[in-house]
């Protein structure tokens, strides 16, 4: 029987680049919050040890898809711990709503949902810590989706402290361009020396995103989207883009602005939530 699992979006409510390590990775401080909006992953367990992705993503080989990689990595990890029941496999499908290269964490969220769901369905019994550690090898953002609570992240994004920022309503807009993360992080003009601050200090300051100036400069679509949103509410880039978002106190206020969105913007309204929809599904 197929079961359905939420794979929610995230927003970076702020994102500051505090340095760059010798290995090229950037150190940062960021605040993750989930949205009650995202992809849906369907999973039907198999008994022959095979992993089949029933809904391939255009332009991505199945073996390279984070969904397939996550499933196979869980197999390997659980097997190494002697916790993989014989014949564990799955047919997996995805109903995709989150854009690729949008800064909403779609691929990382998909991987985390697969790890959490298959750990449950296969009855592997891996702990949240073990799943998060496994997920980190797939991407720096995967652990926050596995843990499922809004978090302040440091290091390269792997040091997580649970926090409970206000749960606002957001209008999120995708300007029709995909921004690969390396494009932003390799840009010579990216600020890389923002001073580190405590979470208490950061929460009292106006939120910002160090990647925003680069995304606006290099992608006119992002600049146009932000220019439009800023007419209505405080707005900024999420992650390395391309999505931008504006915050509102009420759903009705966000939807009033959504009605005025230009046709070239793909926009939606969602609520920020500190407990991930995936975690709620596990309760």
Curated annotation (Swiss-Prot):
Keyword Cell membrane: no
HAMAP family given in the database record: IspE
Keywords: ATP-binding, Isoprene biosynthesis, Kinase, Nucleotide-binding, Transferase
GN (gene name): ispE
Name of this chain's protein: 4-diphosphocytidyl-2-C-methyl-D-erythritol kinase
Entry-linked PANTHER family: 4-DIPHOSPHOCYTIDYL-2-C-METHYL-D-ERYTHRITOL KINASE, CHLOROPLASTIC
GO terms of biological process kind: isopentenyl diphosphate biosynthetic process, methylerythritol 4-phosphate pathway; terpenoid biosynthetic process
Originating organism: Citrobacter koseri (strain ATCC BAA-895 / CDC 4225-83 / SGSC4696)
E.C. no: 2.7.1.148
GO molecular-function terms, A-Z: 4-(cytidine 5'-diphospho)-2-C-methyl-D-erythritol kinase activity; ATP binding
Keyword Acetylation on entry: no
InterPro entries tied to this protein: GHMP_kinase_C_dom, GHMP_kinase_C_sf, GHMP_kinase_N_dom, IspE, Ribosomal_Su5_D2-typ_SF, Ribsml_uS5_D2-typ_fold_subgr
Family statement: Belongs to the GHMP kinase family. IspE subfamily.
Self-association state and partner proteins as the record states: Homodimer.
One Pfam assignment: GHMP_kinases_C
Catalytic activity: 4-CDP-2-C-methyl-D-erythritol + ATP = 4-CDP-2-C-methyl-D-erythritol 2-phosphate + ADP + H(+)
């Amino acid at each position: 029987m197929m079961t359905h699992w939420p794979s929610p979006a995230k927003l970076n409510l702020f994102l500051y680049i505090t340095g760059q390590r010798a290995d090229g990775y950037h150190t940062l401080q960021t605040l993750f919050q989930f949205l009650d909006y995202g992809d849906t992953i369907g999973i039907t367990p198999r008994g022959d040890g095979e992993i089949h992705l029933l809904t391939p993503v255009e332009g991505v080989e199945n073996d390279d898809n984070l969904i397939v990689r996550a499933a196979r990595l869980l197999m390997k990890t659980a097997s190494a711990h002697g916790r993989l029941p014989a014949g564990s496999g799955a047919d997996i499908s995805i109903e995709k709503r989150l854009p690729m290269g949008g800064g909403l964490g779609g691929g990382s969220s998909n991987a985390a949902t697969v790890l959490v769901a298959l750990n449950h369905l296969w009855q592997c019994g891996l702990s949240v810590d073990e799943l998060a550690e496994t997920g980190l090898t797939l991407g720096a953002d995967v652990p926050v989706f596995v843990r499922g609570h809004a978090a302040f992240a440091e290091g390269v994004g792997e040091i997580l402290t649970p926090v409970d920022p206000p749960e606002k309503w957001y209008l999120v807009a995708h300007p029709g361009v995909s921004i690969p993360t390396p494009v932003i992080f390799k840009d010579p003009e990216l600020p890389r020396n923002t001073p580190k601050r405590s979470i208490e200090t950061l929460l009292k300051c106006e939120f910002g995103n160090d990647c925003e100036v680069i995304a606006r400069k290099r992608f006119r679509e992002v600049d146009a989207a932000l220019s439009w949103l800023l007419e209505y509410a405080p707005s900024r880039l999420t992650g390395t883009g391309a999505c931008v978002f504006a915050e509102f106190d009420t759903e009705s206020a966000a939807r009033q602005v959504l009605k005025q969105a230009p046709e070239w913007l793909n926009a939606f309204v969602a609520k920020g939530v500190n407990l991930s929809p995936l975690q709620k599904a596990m309760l």
